[in-house]
UniProtKB/Swiss-Prot annotation:
It is an enzyme of class 2 (transferase). It catalyses: 2-[(2R,5Z)-2-carboxy-4-methylthiazol-5(2H)-ylidene]ethyl phosphate + 4-amino-2-methyl-5-(diphosphooxymethyl)pyrimidine + 2 H(+) = thiamine phosphate + CO2 + diphosphate; 2-(2-carboxy-4-methylthiazol-5-yl)ethyl phosphate + 4-amino-2-methyl-5-(diphosphooxymethyl)pyrimidine + 2 H(+) = thiamine phosphate + CO2 + diphosphate; 4-methyl-5-(2-phosphooxyethyl)-thiazole + 4-amino-2-methyl-5-(diphosphooxymethyl)pyrimidine + H(+) = thiamine phosphate + diphosphate. The gene is thiE. It comes from Dictyoglomus turgidum (strain DSM 6724 / Z-1310). Keywords: Magnesium, Metal-binding, Thiamine biosynthesis, Transferase. 2-[(2R,5Z)-2-carboxy-4-methylthiazol-5(2H)-ylidene]ethyl phosphate binds at S142, Y143, T144, G173, V193, T194. This is Thiamine-phosphate synthase.
Length: 223
């Protein structure tokens, strides 16, 4: 896929899954990602905050092989060097990470660059700086980070969906139980962490979420 085709996945009804071994109830990131991909997910973000860099490298190499096998995107959280070394599809950076312009200069134009945003001002700044997509949230309370950001609610998400030209990935506390609230606003690409990785049956849970997304895409649900 070229970059334009990759970005289409972020614009469409897709599940965007993030790794989080800490919440994977004893399962390794590799095994979790394999199940997620087998279930049909096309976007994986490798997010691992606590492991040594060498361990992250060996892990992300294996995940890159898996995503290539399943023709899925691999986005690496934070690490520009890992992104480039393993030839991932892109990087996702936070508000306190490298500036977008630095990431663009280091990686080049063929890599996708996503940015975490929490406010309208940050969203507009992401547009000005040339982000390829934004992650907007946390929509609901989320505790996967050591210092979680307060939930921003659905109002900003509603505004972004109606006013932003680049893909908006909704993230933060999204579950099977509240996903319809997000999709009814017009959101398409939905990020999930613990709802997937903490599920006793990752494959089954992932298929359920994909089925819901396909229902909206095919008009089964009226937004």
């Amino acid at each position: 896929m070229n970059k334009k085709e990759k970005l289409e996945l972020l614009k469409d009804f897709n599940l965007y899954c993030l790794t989080c071994e800490e919440y994977s109830i004893g399962r390794k990131n590799i095994d979790v990602v394999r199940e997620i991909l087998e279930a049909g997910v096309k976007i994986i973000q490798y997010r691992e905050k606590k492991k040594p860099m060498r361990e992250k490298y060996h892990e992300v190499v294996k995940i890159r092989d898996l995503t290539a096998k399943y023709n899925a995107l691999l986005i690496v959280n934070d690490h520009l060097d890992l992104t480039k070394i393993v030839e991932a599809d892109g990087v996702h950076i936070g508000q306190e990470d490298y500036p977008i312009e630095v990431a663009k200069e280091f990686l080049g134009e063929n890599f996708i660059i996503g940015l975490t945003t929490h406010t309208k001002e940050q969203v507009m700044e992401a547009l000005r700086k040339g982000a390829d997509y934004i992650g907007l949230g946390p929509i609901f309370p989320s505790y996967t980070k050591e210092k979680p950001h307060p939930p921003i609610g659905i109002e900003i998400l509603d505004w972004a969906i109606k006013n932003i030209s680049i893909p908006v990935v909704a993230i933060g506390g999204i579950k099977e139980s509240n996903i319809h609230e997000i999709l009814n606003l017009g959101a398409k690409c939905i990020a999930m962490v613990t709802e997937i990785v903490s599920s006793p049956n990752i494959y089954e849970k992932t298929r359920k979420i994909i089925h819901i997304l396909e229902g909206y895409k095919n008009g089964k649900y009226i937004a």
